[in-house]
Amino acid sequence: MAEPRRVAFISLSPVRRREADFAGAEREPPRLEPQPYREPARAEPAPRADAQPPARDKPLPQREVSRAEPPMALQREPPRPEPPPPPLPLQTPPPRESASRAEPPPRPPKETVRLELVLKDPTDESCVEFSYPELLLCGEQRKKLVHTEDPFTDEHKERQEVEMLAKKFEMKYGGKARKHRKDRLQDLIDIGFGYDETDPFIDNSEAYDELVPASLTTKYGGFYINTGTLQFRQASDTEEDDFTDNQKHKPPKVPKIKEDDIEVKKRKRKEEGEKEKKPRKKVPKQLGVVALNSHKSEKKKKRYKDSLSLAAMIRKFQKEKDALKKESTPKVPVTPSSSSLPKPPCVTTALGDDIPDLGLNSADPDLPIFVSTNEHELFQEAENALEMLDDFDFDRLLDATSDGSPLSESGGENGNTTHPTFPSQVVPKVVPTLPEGLPVLLEKRIEDLRVAAKLFDEEGRKKFFTQDMNNILLDIELQLQELGPVIRSGVYSHLEAFVPCNKETLVKRLKKLHLNVQDDRLREPLQKLKLAVSNVMPEQLFKYQEDCQARSQAKCAKLQADEEREKNGSDDDDDEKPGKRVIGPRKKFHWDDTIRTLLCNLVEIKLGCYELEPNKSQSAEDYLKSFMETEVKPLWPKGWMQARMLFKESRSVHNHLTSAPAKKKVIPASKPKVKECSPKKDPKAPASVVASGGGPSTSSSTSIVASASSSSAPAQETICLDDSLDEDLSFPSASLDLVSEALAVINNGNKGPSVGSRLNVPTTKPRPGLREEKLASIMSKLPLATPKKLDSTQTAHSSSLIAGHTGPVPKKPQDLAHTGISSGLIAGSSIQNPKVSLEPLPARLLQQGLQRSSQIHASSSSQTHVSSSQAQAAASSHALGTSEAQDASSLTQVTKVHQHSAVQQNYVSPLQATISKSQTNPVVKLSNNPQLSCSSQLLKTSDKPLMYRLPLSTPSPGNGSQGPHPLVSRTAPSTTTSSNYLAKAMVSQISTQGFKSPFSMAASPKLAASPKPATSPKPLPSPKPSVSPKPSLSAKPSISTKQISKSNPAPKPAVCPSSSSPNTLVAQSSHSTSNNPVHKQPSGMNISRQSPTLNLLPSNRTSGLPTTKTLQAPSKLTNSSSTGTAGKNSLSGIPMNVPASRGSNLNSSGANRTSLSGGTGSGTQGATKPLSTPHRPTSASGSSVVTASVQSTAGASLLANASPLTLMTSPLSVTNQTVTPFGMLGGLVPVTMPFQFPLELLGFGTDTAGVTATSGSTSAALHHSLTQNLLKSLQPGAQHAAALPHSPLPAHLQQAFNDGGQSKGDTKLPRKPQ
């Protein structure tokens, strides 16, 4: 089968072949025998192929010649060499041959045809198919083509082709048409059978049957729809023939029945179908009452064309009833016209089967249609129908009779054939009595209606509801509106007897009339309003035209000027080009009282119509708006009025109906806004923070908050996220004042009276110890009470803690406590504010801090001497965003503490040195403030907030200083650690305070450092990550950070950004600490130990920029050592590492960090490399370095708590407070706080001399470098990096740090759980 085979087909059937063979036999009897050919044809084609050749030797040539088929001859030969293949194709044709055997016999035998077929291998999609008849036809056509040599045979051939084509189409499309007529008889009986009367789309409420006698037919024949008058005509034979011919197309069976019978049957079926439908209707129906007078139909038809009075109708019914009685008494009489028509029994039985309810007792075709089996039943049905129809629908009844329908007299309104048995049934119809106690006027109008209805019946009418009748009905309706529903219903029932409609229709009609009257009432006000508008419009149109002319003139002048400029080649008009598109003056209609009053009157009337609306599908607002759009608005010229303006101007009238929904909509919208601003109960937070410094945490740090609010309230009030950049500029004076006061306090050695005076709370400075105790107690309570309010409460806590830290230090120096509180409050307030107000407050505080720090650094960089380290610390704390007051207080406290105890002074000296360096190094400052924030958060977050403070107190004594001194020392270290931790915590918060504390820190530092150029956006991202970990707190800190970032640039570029960033970090870190209360509690413990650490840190800080990190590192060391001396030693040992870490942090952090560590270029770089390695592993980015520094500073106390916050360091785990700081230092040492937290605050308790000696040079150097670094940090990030001496930080580490700052949110979030 690979190659196509050519198979011989014999087209003739075996019968034909036989005939052909016999013909051949006659010609050559000896050779041709029928059998050999029959068998091959029937059974095996192959044998036939073998047998045929000898037999065809002679006959075939003759046939071929006669056929003149050279092509067929060619076709015949191929199969001979291939006899075997034929069986395959020949097996398929045999059935077709057998099918065609029946038809061919009469036709002359066809000659044998050989077909050559090409068989192809079948595929999955197709196989070879052949149609034997088509092949034969093709063969015949070929024959004709061959034989058509005679040109005169063309016509004959064409005719044959056309006939073949016609037959083909007839067989295809026209066949089997008559086969369906056998079973269609029942279809003619009820053509409407199957019609769903329950379908809501079909309204049969007013339909009724008209029984058509057999002698009549509709004017145009067939069914009709009940619209208008039904016209009848006498049935005629020709019409019947035509009618039946038309019907034949539908039921082909008609020819079998006589046409007359069919005609009658059809009519009967039609009418019976309608009758059958009738019983399905609501009212029972009387069958065939009128059929008996069908012989009188012609006369009646003429009579009914005229309007009939009720009396005439009754008389007519009575006559028909009598006739019916007479004819139906003996038997059911047959109508003369119908009896003349013969009825085949088949039809009768068919009808009887189809209409069993008609009980056919006679073969008469009309009986089943018109007469009920029982006369009594017939009349009984009529009586029932009359009773059910309380009243005739005279209107319809008369209209139907006037239409000329002989049967309409029996047509009731509801489709019932109502034929009264007695005249009394119609005339005395039961009329419901009127309710008692009706108004006299109403009764009079009802009587008028009765009279009018009576006149209408007597005179006959075309229309019942005339204008007079409508007026009477409307008057009745208006009076009924004042009566109760029961009385109204009774009156309606009474009126129903006098109107040609039922009660429901009457009620609807009355309501419609009432509404129409209301609409009529609108016409006059509408007309008045239109007149008023038309009187006013000319003037306004004139003004509008003048405006248009002036505008066009101005436009032309401008175009000319523009053309001149273009000719001159001037580019000055570039800015004005957008203005070239001049829009014409607005078509603004100016209202006056008259028009407004007219509009209100119109709307009031329309509202009255709305009240009358039975189905109020629209709300009052939509109803009025659509009315104004369609009816009122067109009163103005096009374009001069809008529907919304009409609605607005008429609000005084419809406000009671349309205002409620609007209010509902507005209320929900406002609530979300409040939530967004302060997710944690803090919508009022900004105000409270401004007023009290720590809205949510006012209870714990109320005094501190108050002082902070007094010092930073103005900045907080004005600072908003949106205005943060401008806010920085707007409040530099306050920051400068605070800074100057703090400097004065530091220089004078006072306890910060000026700061105290600034701070409302500072007045309590004399009782720093008490304040610290209160703060500690409040803080301890707040964490527990405010865990849910992390955002507001934690922020408050952080601020309070910052203040508290400052406060604790002030325990020894009251001024320091006051100034520390004020600065801490400012920082805390800004932190609290972030929490309370979500963002604005922290931004403000940071901005203030930045401004103050920048101012302090700029103005008092030289003033910071030995004290200058403290002063710088204060300035840095201000920069951090704590507050200048806090800074000053810390300095003052430090000074006093130094004076009070030499031991504490020793510790404080390192702290102060660290603080001064931290001032110089934004990181150090940041770490300080963050520590405060962290500590406050620790107190809040954990049940150990008190523990945190207590550890502070205890460690300070452990340090070997006096109780107060240890407190101060402790406070200072705690503050330092707190600030560091806060920085860290803030960073971790920003980064979701958990997993990558370093990244978090780095991000936070970036926020602080780069706030000035482009870092402010980065801080934002970091806060956002923190938001996810702590939605409420984090979100607020992030916002505050953004604000701070923005404000930082505005204030002095160098210090301000750092300080504000630190504040932000502090706030965030505090948030993060609150998130990890357990860790934070250990942090508290560490902080208490850290007081020595802080002292040690100062020595590190003395080194330079690295001091910040050094401070952090020493914090951890101190925590581990737990003793002030050991802490100091550790600090001295750590300084280089910390600076290195810080340097790396600064490098990683970017411009911010660079600016911070600018002062300690070489030292920081050296430290940066070592730290960078641990930092990278820990946080894979500069962020972790920053966190490390924060953690290291806060490590002992806050870092442990921040360990979770510090994603970086597992060593910061709560369990290992002492070790944690070290681990953090090792891993996180590179952490450089972009924000400078006032480390001086942390080192309040250090001896002035010690601080001066230890950190004097460092302080001066740090301050100088810090100012430079801060300025650089304010500059673009690239510049910062270049300026940083920490650039030696590995490029990959720096990049990782920067990347970490950007992606800290994502990376930190995963780590936060750690």
From Swiss-Prot:
Biased composition (Pro residues): 81-96, 1014-1028
Keyword Metal-binding applies: no
Sequence ranges of Basic and acidic residues compositional bias: 16-31, 55-67, 560-570, 673-684, 1305-1314
GO cellular component: nucleoplasm
List of residues that carry N6-acetyllysine: 1036, 1116
Cross-linked sites for Glycyl lysine isopeptide (Lys-Gly) (interchain with G-Cter in SUMO2): 258
Modified residues (Phosphoserine): 13, 236, 297, 402, 405, 408, 570, 1091
KW Ubl conjugation (keyword) present: yes
UniProt keyword list: Acetylation, Isopeptide bond, Phosphoprotein, Ubl conjugation
Polar residues composition-biased segments: 415-424, 792-801, 883-893, 1057-1132, 1142-1153
Segments of skewed composition (Low complexity): 330-341, 685-709, 849-879, 1003-1013, 1029-1040
Stretches for region Disordered: 1-113, 236-288, 322-345, 400-424, 559-584, 657-709, 785-818, 849-893, 948-975, 1003-1185, 1288-1314
Phosphothreonine PTM sites in chain numbering: 229, 238
Similarity comment text for this entry: Belongs to the ubinuclein family.
UniProt-recorded name of the protein: Ubinuclein-2
Organism of provenance: Mus musculus
Gene that encodes it: Ubn2
